[in-house]
Amino acid sequence: MDVTVKWMDGAMFVGESGSGHSLVMDGPEDLGGRNLGPRPMEMLLLGAGGCAMFDVVSMLKKARQKVHDCRVDIQAERADAIPAVFTTLNMHFVVSGKDLKESQVKRAVELSAEKYCSASIMFEAAGVAMSHSYAIEEFGED
């Protein structure tokens, strides 16, 4: 996997993925940025959330669950000293659908955390205290 990150000016960088996509990262104004994009550390959390969400939604669809919507809310704490690495991270999945089986949602979240989500597993291997939780919301008619 290859990516390129190019400095634009101030604290703004443009990342280009090997799959041909670009994104802007920027810092806050007090650090020379213009706040035009997420911070690089936020990008790490967004990537982990996307990775885990891909797994969970895919597994629920394979289990023929009627998923209408899904999101993951991530709360992370960072060390006070530099390097300000992540120390704790919780992924809370909120899955809405019709007649969802809790056992299927629980299994999807657990399998993502323990086996499939490379990003989450990498955080855990680096010493981040990881936790995962979920909530199920019933959604009306199909």
Predicted features by range, described:
Residues M1-L46, V57-D142:
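Extended beta-strand/beta-hairpin segments
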